């Protein structure tokens, strides 16, 4: 099935056409389509980024998993998320961050950018090693 979006507001002006697993964007893209969504009130974007999410793995998977959270993000049009460091272990050193990165690599449905903790254990007393 081929879908066409014409007269739509597009991230970068023009037409947006989904054809054979490719997106064509341009001012004069002409492709026959099974369905044409022609409406100036439609806006088409390549994807959104959420810079504040709580994917609670490792440590709190009963609240949210990387798999469930990123699948939900994908369904909502998000192509990337940035996850907060309130985890166990807290990603305040490379060793702890690696635990999180391994889970992300295994389970994420979209790109995940993890934030490290600024202070050791998120305690607010000693800066973590940010080098």
Give residue spans per PLM region.
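N-terminal metal-binding scaffold of metallo-dependent hydrolase/deaminase domains
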Residues: 1-34
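Divalent-metal coordination cores built from histidine and acidic residues
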Residues: 72-131
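Generic alpha-helical propensity signal that fires on short helical segments
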Residues: 21-23, 28, 62, 67-71, ...
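Detector for Asparagine
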Residues: 4, 13, 27, 39-41, ...
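Conserved protein kinase catalytic core
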Residues: 13, 56-58, 123
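Short, flexible, glycine/charge-rich loop motifs used to bind or transfer phosphoryl groups or to couple energy/partner
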Residues: 12, 38-39, 44, 102-103, ...
């Amino acid at each position: 099935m081929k879908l066409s979006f014409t007269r739509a507001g597009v991230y970068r002006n023009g037409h947006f056409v989904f054809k054979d697993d490719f997106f064509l964007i341009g001012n004069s893209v002409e492709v026959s389509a099974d369905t044409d969504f022609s409406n100036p009130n439609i806006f088409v974007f390549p994807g959104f980024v959420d810079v504040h999410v709580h994917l609670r793995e490792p440590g709190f998977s009963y609240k949210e998993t990387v798999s469930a959270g990123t699948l939900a993000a994908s369904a909502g049009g998000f192509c990337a998320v940035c996850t907060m460091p309130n985890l166990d272990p807290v990603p305040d050193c490379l060793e702890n961050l690696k635990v999180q990165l391994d889970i992300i690599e295994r389970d994420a449905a979209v790109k995940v950018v993890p934030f490290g903790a600024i202070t050791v254990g998120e305690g607010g007393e000693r800066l973590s090693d940010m080098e």
